[in-house]
A protein has these predicted regions:
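Active-site beta3 strand of CheY-like receiver
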Residues: 50-56
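C-terminal output helix
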Residues: 108-121, 125
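Receiver (REC) domain active-site loop signature in two-component systems and cognate sites
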Residues: 61
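Two-component/phosphorelay signaling modules centered on CheY-like receiver
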Residues: 5, 16-35, 41, 47
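Active-site residues of response regulator receiver
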Residues: 14, 58, 88
């Protein structure tokens, strides 16, 4: 893996520990992984001095769902450019369309295929690197 990809940071946001574990294992060794179990913590980490390069975001979470988190992140100049991939059990076309409407760059339904997650994350990280270098 090219060095510029290995230094990239991924934030996994899900209220279920097992989902975080599965996603973390799929990406471990390729990226620096951090996680949040709720939307407020995700927003805090995304706005930190070392923001993630990409966010994997569940939709169905208590208190603040993934749509609200995405809307909030896209509203602020410091976080609006972070690519967000929804990873969710919500598989209806309406839900997927809604996710893109909130600013997500991709939408993956559970149960996940680790190889597909790896490929999509890599693609969006590479696109972000190209945009950052323009």
């Amino acid at each position: 893996m090219p060095e510029e990809l290995a230094s990239r940071r991924i934030l996994i946001v899900d209220d279920i520990s097992q989902n975080i574990k599965v996603l973390g294992e799929a990406l471990r060794g390729e990226y620096t992984i951090s996680f949040a179990k709720d939307g407020r913590r995700a927003i805090e980490l995304a706005g930190s001095e070392t923001p993630p390069d990409l966010i994997l975001l569940d939709i169905m979470m208590p208190e603040m769902d993934g749509y609200e988190v995405c809307r909030e992140l896209k509203r602020h100049p410091n976080t609006c450019e972070i690519p967000i991939i929804f990873i969710t059990a919500k598989s209806d076309v309406e839900d997927e369309t809604k996710g893109f409407g909130f600013g997500a760059v991709d939408y993956i339904t559970k149960p996940i295929n680790p190889t597909i997650v790896q490929a999509r994350v890599r693609t969006h990280i590479e696109l972000k690197l190209h945009r950052d270098n323009l």
